[in-house]
Amino acid sequence: MDRIIRATAGDGAIKMAVINARDTVERARQIHGCAPTACAALGRTLCAASLMGQDMKEENAALTIRINGGGPLGGIVAVSDCDGNVRGYVGNPATELPLRSDGKLNVGAAVGRDGMFTVSRDIGLREPYIGSVELVSGEIAEDLTAYLLESEQVPSACALGVLVDTDCTVKAAGGFIVQLMPGAEEEIISRLEDNIFMMDQLTTILSEDGEEELFRQVLKGFDYHTVGEHPIEYRCYCSRERVEAALASIGSDALAELAQDGKDISVGCQFCGTEYTFTPAELEAIQPKPVEE
């Protein structure tokens, strides 16, 4: 079962969240037909969005990460609800590049580094809060760390990983965010840095030992306490009603033109691939939204 586990350590000076998202990322791979490198990029971004989304307190809140680094992968979009359930897509899911010299998938080259890492938080106000930073590496975790520090002023350490098996299915996927509370002592910071530097490979821990081992390695030398756990999944909220609302927003002239063409139209969801078909009569029945002055 995919899940997020949260813990605190160092007498409250450290907050850590771990995500295990193998099934979620595998579902995304199946929906979009992702090649291994594209799967790793999308999977890391889904994990990042889930970790950030589940930390929002407002009911029905949503968090969106958008990345476009100018690489062959195109843009990445990942959306999380306030429980960490996610959906997403990439511009070119067939993107596949040669492995790096260390044998790892070359996510940074696929994403590119000439662009922005943008986070939008919609908590039900008139306008969402939007923050952006320039991409650091295109490897996602480093970019997320930079965003949290520069845009939200939260010192953090992040790791994200996706292990793709020889048959192109997802063998492991997940990551963590460790955040320091204001006033954390230098000794705590140094110990955390050493622990993260010395830890085993992230996806190896998740596939062989599980989340608890990840907590033990990252928080070695600290007393830590689990404060919450809940399941997450790949979840799309599309519906025929939402598609009708989107069509209503294009205006009466455009709707009339589509109906007069005399052919059925199909509208596909970018997140889950579901197709919604409308006949000319159904298009005529859609009431256009009034234009706001």
Where would I find each of the regions flagged by the language model?
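Interaction interfaces in information-processing and related assembly proteins
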Residues: 1-228
